[in-house]
């Protein structure tokens, strides 16, 4: 029995860790639950494999924080297409309206957090789990041998990275050992960027496509507008070290558009 549990955890861990992969849009996977990312302005979807949405973050443990360069989702504030593939996705609508000062990289390309620079769009994921775990490296930290099938909830904010100390400080949204009511929690979550769109979906990352679907069930909460974040605060997060061992931004999964792979948004 113990070997079976370890095998199950190993399999799920492998499914959670994002890799790279190519798929033909003509080949739609079948038999899977709803997939992510999506256009959050469209509420339609015909996937019938519904599941109970995860509780609010206050009832779950924060298990991981990571970023993707360019938004994986498409939304009202991030609708500028950035291309196909793992380096595609969507950009904040104001990306082309930044000043020269906002676009200046204070490290001249040598920032500690790799894969971003001023002017880039990033999508940040605060991943929460119903398991009794501690935050750590990779999404595998969201489960354990004793909790191999957790309820997962991802809080999401898309940021426009700028060189401006008056912009948001990423440190305000990190972990730093913060506990509340016995649960691991982010210091805070972004506000003022619209009511989050909540829906049933899956894990993301460039490993998956419409032909290669993720089997995991994830509740998503995606804020619809971009916010500016100071690039220096992201560099500092990596330079100082973080429990997630995040030192670079990840690639994206291309938008899921097939109705049979999307849940209806209530």
Please state what every model-predicted region is.
Residues 34-133:
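Short N-terminal edge-element motif at the start of the domain
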Residues 1-9:
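Bacterial N-terminal signal peptides that target proteins for export
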Residues 130-207:
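Short helix-loop boundary/capping segments
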Residues 203-266:
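Long, compositionally biased interface segments
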Residues 23-26, 31:
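Boundary at the C-terminal end of the N-terminal hydrophobic targeting segment
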Residues 13-23:
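C-terminal segment of classical bacterial N-terminal signal peptides
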Residues 56-57, 61, 66, 146-149, ...:
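Non-catalytic macromolecular-recognition regions in eukaryotic signaling proteins
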